[in-house]
Amino acid sequence: MFRVTSVLLVIVLLNLVVLTNACHMDCSKMTCCSGICCFYCGRPMCPGTRRALLQRLVGHQR
């Protein structure tokens, strides 16, 4: 059981590292076009990105 938990933790940490690097590149722009990075660095989202995220949220609720 402990082994499974540690493997999952490593996967999550690796994803965070990759995401952080990608988001730092995205943060240099005035608006960012990938939703998670916008939350990560507090940038305003591109209008298309916001619309796509809203559509995805509405789609999941149905």
Swiss-Prot record:
Tissue: Expressed by the venom duct.
Propeptide segments, given as residue ranges: 23-49
Signal peptide bounds: 1-22
Annotated disulfide bonds: C23-C33, C27-C38, C32-C41, C37-C46
Location(s), subcellular: Secreted
Coiled coil: none
GO CC annotations on file: extracellular region
Alphabetically ordered keywords of this record: Disulfide bond, Neurotoxin, Secreted, Signal, Toxin
Gene Ontology molecular function terms on file: toxin activity
UniProt keyword Signal present: yes
Superkingdom as given in the UniProt entry: Eukaryota
Domain notes: The cysteine framework is XI (C-C-CC-CC-C-C).
Function: Probable neurotoxin.
Family of this protein: Belongs to the conotoxin I2 superfamily.
Protein name per the record: Conotoxin Im11.9
UniProt source species: Conus imperialis (Imperial cone)
Lineage per the UniProt record: Eukaryota, Metazoa, Spiralia, Lophotrochozoa, Mollusca
